[in-house]
Amino acid sequence: MRDLHVKTRIKPAQTRNRVKRERKPINWRPLITWGSRLVCGLAGLATVGGICYGGYRYLSQWEFAPLPLKEIEVSKLQRLKRDDVIAQAGVRPGDSMLGLRLRDIGSQLAKNPWIDKVQVRRYFPHTLAIEVVERVPVAVVNMGFLYYMDAGGTVFKPLTQGDSLDYPVITGVAEEDLARDPVGTREALKGAVALMDQLRRGKEFTLADVSEIHLDKGFGLTLFTAAGGVPVRLGNGGYEAKLARFVRIYGELREHMAAVEYIDCDYLDKIIVKKG
């Protein structure tokens, strides 16, 4: 018998019908409405800000603006005059309090060489206060031209006609030194100030007995006596001890200073007197 081979056909599976989901359209209306409101709000703020700023500028420039300046207070002055300070500040009664530029006023006043520090305050409704700290000269620095120097070693003003010369004279400093090494030069000048302070406290030998203080960055300070113009070398620092040793012999040498070439006190335990 023959085997019967029956070919079996596999019936393809029936595909299921897919259910199509309908996508809902995006509702852009709330987003557009919110964005429009945001843009309108920002535009409104910008408009209000512009109006406020324009009004501020208008009021600050108006001659008879609200909140006029009525009182200008100036701190106590030693050398400067109140009217000169107010004139340099560039303010006057009737100016708008809103239009005052305090920083500009302070910068203008700081140009005055006699003014060390300045502070400007505004007190509503009608007051402006100007507080000034003046410079006090302690010496005259000879740099080809004569300049005043304050206690901080700052050279601040060239002398003009009418300025007092009744101050100790410092030499050995050039304008080029201030330009090339302002910090080092100022420190050296502060050393001269320290020496002058020590001399002011003296009894037998004082600042009045000194005609000149010479500054040398390498060798330090040398003072010149008013009697005979004798150089007394002091070097750098330790002025109290060096002056104390000098005073011990100054009484004996006072009458013979014309015969002395120089005195060197820049030693720890001795003094050299060089006679001419």
Curated annotation (Swiss-Prot):
Cytoplasmic topological domain: 1-37
Recorded GO CC terms: cell division site; FtsQBL complex; plasma membrane
Membrane topology field: Single-pass type II membrane protein
Membrane topology, Periplasmic segments: 61-276
Keyword Cell division attributed: yes
Pfam families in the cross-refs: FtsQ_DivIB_C, POTRA_1
Domain POTRA: 67-135
Spans through the membrane: 38-60
Keywords, comma-separated and alphabetical: Cell cycle, Cell division, Cell inner membrane, Cell membrane, Membrane, Transmembrane, Transmembrane helix
GO biological process, one term: FtsZ-dependent cytokinesis
Record family assignment: Belongs to the FtsQ/DivIB family. FtsQ subfamily.
Identification of the protein by name: Cell division protein FtsQ
Source organism of the structure: Geobacter sulfurreducens (strain ATCC 51573 / DSM 12127 / PCA)
